[in-house]
């Protein structure tokens, strides 16, 4: 009991102090709630700086009549704009409905027209088919009657034969009369006039020619002279100088240049610049002469490096010369044409066919072929070789030999190597001996002056041929 009394007295004496502490905590909590954000958890929100700022703006807006008027005008315009947009939506909806209705009407009309056309065509075709069937039935009945009559009247064979021919004539006449109806005859007439089979046949022939035939390209190894000119040639050599038409810009530039040349300032400047230009040209010539005639090893080293890096190569200069003579020259087409010519040239060379060699080879190659041929014949040697395959045709070198360009082509062939004597007996190789032979051809360009007046572009001839090696396969 004494302890309880002591605790009660202590609480009663310290009660004012607890009340003061509680009051301070409440004040601190209120002060914190003023600085909480809008999404805070407090239920009571006091006025802040932003609310006072908004109140000031509202007061100024209410006190300013012009601002209120502009706000009202903006509201009215927004309402008008809303009305216009609604009206536009209604109009677009109406126009789309009209378009859909028109499209449906056109579609229904087209369907009805198509049905009418198809029904009329079906009726016409059915009528024509019925007419043809009736004509066939009539012909069959007449044939059956003629057959029965010929069986019963075997004694009168000649008369029955004449009657059957007459009946056949009547059958074809009736069939022709059935076909002479306006509907069927019109159909056959249209088919005859259209001639679809002829058109299709012509188209197929054109496609076959395009697929089978090679595209027309200029020949580099053959010269085909044009057909002779049958018209009259003019012998007049008069020349008339005609002035070329200038554009407006060129005319203005010419007039401006003439005015500038006539001005005294331009004349004075040109008179002053002429000695300067002449002096600079003299200095440049002196420097060039010193550079070219210098004995300094450093200068020689620089010149060698310049020639090494900046000088045009032999192949480039050769190709440039070829294109200057023949602008339509193409190296891939040239290699393809060489591949086509290899077989006839090698066969003609082994057989001694001079006429074929004249088309593709130079005089030196033909003379070499005839000399080798006569030498082998005197010794009784006969080559029975046969060319099997040609591969790996490529252009290896292009260079100049004097004034004429030279192209060296490489290729390899597979040949049957067989050497016989005068009696036809095999001396070397055999019919089963196959060799791979590596060839090199030197093609030289022939000038147009050597070909004649009709030649426009130069052509190429086989200037030299050699075998680099032979490898036995079988």
UniProtKB/Swiss-Prot annotation:
GO terms for biological process: protein targeting to mitochondrion. SUPFAM superfamilies: NTF2-like. PANTHER family: MITOCHONDRIAL IMPORT INNER MEMBRANE TRANSLOCASE SUBUNIT TIM44. Belongs to the Tim44 family. Essential component of the PAM complex, a complex required for the translocation of transit peptide-containing proteins from the inner membrane into the mitochondrial matrix in an ATP-dependent manner. Recruits mitochondrial HSP70 to drive protein translocation into the matrix using ATP as an energy source. It holds the Pfam family Tim44. It is found in: Mitochondrion inner membrane. Probable component of the PAM complex at least composed of a mitochondrial HSP70 protein, TIMM44 and TIMM14. The complex interacts with the TIMM23 component of the TIM17:23 complex. InterPro entries: NTF2-like_dom_sf, Tim44-like, Tim44-like_dom. Residues 145-165 have a biased composition (Polar residues). Expressed in roots, flowers, young cotyledons and leaves. Residues 132-165 are annotated as: Disordered. One of its GO terms (cellular component) is TIM23 mitochondrial import inner membrane translocase complex. Keywords: Coiled coil, Membrane, Mitochondrion, Mitochondrion inner membrane, Transit peptide. Residues 132-143 have a biased composition (Basic and acidic residues). This is Mitochondrial import inner membrane translocase subunit TIM44-1. GO terms for molecular function: ABC-type protein transporter activity. Disulfide bonds: none annotated. It comes from Arabidopsis thaliana (Mouse-ear cress). Residues 1-54 form a transit peptide. Its main location: mitochondrion.
């Amino acid at each position: 009991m004494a302890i309880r009394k002591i605790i009660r007295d202590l609480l009663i004496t310290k009660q004012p102090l607890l009340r003061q502490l509680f009051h301070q905590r409440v004040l601190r909590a209120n002060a914190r709630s003023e600085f909480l954000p809008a999404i805070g958890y407090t239920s009571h929100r006091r006025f802040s700086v932003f609310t006072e700022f908004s109140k000031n703006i509202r007061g100024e807006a209410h006190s300013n009549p012009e601002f209120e008027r502009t706000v009202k005008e903006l509201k009215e315009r927004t309402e008008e704009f809303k009305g216009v947009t609604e009206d536009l939506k209604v109009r677009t909806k109406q126009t789309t409905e009209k378009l859909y209705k028109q499209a449906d009407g056109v579609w229904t009309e087209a369907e009805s027209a198509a049905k009418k056309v198809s029904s009329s065509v079906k009726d016409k075709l059915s009528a024509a088919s019925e007419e043809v069937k009736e004509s066939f039935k009539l012909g069959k009945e007449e044939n059956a009657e003629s057959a029965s009559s010929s069986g019963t009247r075997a004694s009168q064979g000649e008369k029955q034969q004449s009657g059957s021919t007459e009946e056949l004539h009547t059958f074809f006449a009736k069939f022709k009369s059935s076909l002479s109806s306006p509907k069927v005859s019109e159909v056959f007439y249209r088919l005859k006039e259209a001639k679809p089979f002829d058109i299709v046949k012509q188209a197929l022939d054109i496609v076959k020619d395009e697929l089978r035939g090679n595209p027309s390209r200029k020949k580099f190894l053959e010269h085909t002279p044009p057909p002779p000119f049958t018209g009259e040639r003019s012998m007049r050599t008069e020349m008339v100088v005609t002035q070329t038409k200038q554009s407006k810009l060129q005319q203005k530039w010419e007039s401006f240049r003439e005015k500038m040349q006539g001005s005294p300032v331009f004349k004075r400047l040109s008179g002053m610049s002429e000695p300067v230009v002449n002096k600079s040209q003299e200095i440049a010539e002196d420097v060039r002469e010193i550079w070219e005639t210098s004995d300094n090893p450093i200068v020689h080293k620089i010149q060698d490096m310049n020639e090494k890096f900046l000088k045009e190569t032999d192949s480039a200069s050769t190709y440039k010369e070829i294109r200057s003579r023949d602008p339509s020259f193409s190296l891939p087409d040239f290699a393809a044409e060489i591949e086509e010519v290899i077989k006839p040239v090698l066969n003609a060379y082994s057989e001694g066919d001079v006429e074929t060699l004249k088309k593709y080879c130079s005089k030196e190659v033909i003379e070499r072929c005839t000399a080798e041929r006569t030498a082998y014949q005197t010794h009784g040697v006969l080559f029975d070789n046969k060319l099997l395959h040609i591969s790996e045709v490529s252009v290896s070198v292009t260079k100049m030999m004097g004034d004429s360009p030279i192209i060296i082509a490489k290729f390899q062939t597979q040949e049957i190597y067989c050497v016989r004597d005068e009696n036809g007996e095999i001396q070397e190789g055999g019919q089963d001996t196959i060799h791979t032979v590596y060839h090199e051809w030197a093609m030289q360009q022939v000038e147009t002056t050597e070909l004649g007046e009709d030649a426009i572009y130069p052509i190429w001839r086989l200037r030299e041929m050699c075998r680099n090696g032979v490898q036995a396969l079988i």
